[in-house]
Structure formats: C-alpha cells, structure tokens
C-alpha cells in the first residue's frame, strides 16, 4: 500500500470540498488522516514510510518497504497542518510539527547540507540511483512546512529550520545569472542538470 494517495487526498479534499458532498469529504479526510498519521507514520521510527503491507499495514523488508522520502513526508505535514486548522484540532498540528522536525533531522545531509531525495529506514543501499540528489521541490515543500509550523505553533525549531532551508536553497538552487532555480543538484549541492525548476 502506497503513501501517495492518502497523502495527496489530505490536500485535495480541502481544495475541492466546495464541489463535493460534505459527507464524502468528511469521510475522506478522516480516512486519510488515519492512514497518514497512524498507518504510514511509524511511531517507533519517528518517520513516515512510503509503503506498508496491503494485507495488514505492517512494515515490509524490501526496497519499497524500507523506503523513506523525506520531502514527501514533509510535504504531507503541511497538508496535515492545514487540516488541523480547518478541523479545529490543534493536537493534529502539534503532531504534524513533531513528525516534520523528526523527518527533517533524519533527512538532512549532515555532510553536505540539503535533504536527501530517498533514504532507507534501515540504512541499507537504495534501489533509486538518485537517492542522494537534492531536488528543488523537496526543499520548497519542506520550507513551506517549517514556516507553517512556526506560524501555527510558534515553535522556534521550525523557524530555525526554515532559515537553514532558505539559506541552502538560495545558495545552491539559484542560477547566478538569471532569476530562476536549477531543479536538480548532486549530493554536494552542485548543479547536476541545467534544467530549471
């Protein structure tokens, strides 16, 4: 079972709630909140995994079953914060901030800076060859999460991480000649492809 669907439905449900039956939206929100925050979030790891067993929601010891995508997890947490605000559930916002801080600490490259694209929850080799690349969208979504976490809770760790992300992004992704960003960096933060994001 894949994290992508319940994760994106957390956001999509708020975007289209004016167009769809309220009962369906409310049911979808509750189902997706449960999936994201109770099934894919692994409390003992402090992380969200990308895949669990479709049979019993357990962890699977395979490439897919060990995969952690820090950017995906961090993006989901600002969706959860929006839902927490919409539903009047501050405890949901607090939990999202806690997960976000745990995830960014885990996903931050301690040697070169930036957030890894993919990681293995057991520290084993990755199937994805691009696992150590630094992608623009991962950093943008993470920055949104951190500034939103600070705005909603006043948590100073979120503000510090936002500043760290801001500095990294404007130092590494920005094209020095034109007001655009490169989309893909290597692990060291050097432009990997001249494509713009």
Region locations from a protein language model:
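Glycan-recognition and catalytic cores of secretory/periplasmic carbohydrate-active enzymes
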Residues: 1-197
């Amino acid at each position: 079972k894949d994290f992508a669907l319940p994760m994106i439905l957390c956001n999509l449900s708020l975007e289209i709630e004016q167009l769809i039956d309220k009962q369906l939206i409310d049911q979808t929100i509750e189902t997706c909140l449960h999936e994201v925050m109770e099934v894919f979030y692994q409390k003992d790891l402090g992380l969200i995994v990308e895949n669990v067993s479709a049979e019993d929601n357990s962890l699977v010891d395979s490439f897919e079953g060990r995969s952690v995508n820090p950017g995906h997890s961090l993006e989901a947490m600002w969706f959860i914060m929006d839902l927490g605000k919409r539903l009047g559930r501050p405890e949901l916002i607090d939990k999202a901030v806690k997960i976000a801080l745990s995830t960014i600490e885990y996903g931050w490259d301690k040697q070169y800076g930036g957030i890894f694209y993919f990681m293995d929850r057991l520290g084993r080799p990755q199937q994805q060859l691009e696992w150590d690349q630094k992608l623009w969208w991962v950093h943008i979504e993470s920055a949104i999460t951190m500034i939103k976490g600070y705005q909603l809770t006043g948590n100073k760790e979120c503000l510090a991480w936002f500043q760290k992300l801001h500095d990294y992004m404007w130092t590494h992704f920005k094209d020095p000649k034109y007001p655009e960003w490169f989309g893909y960096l290597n692990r060291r933060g050097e432009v990997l492809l001249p494509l713009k994001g």
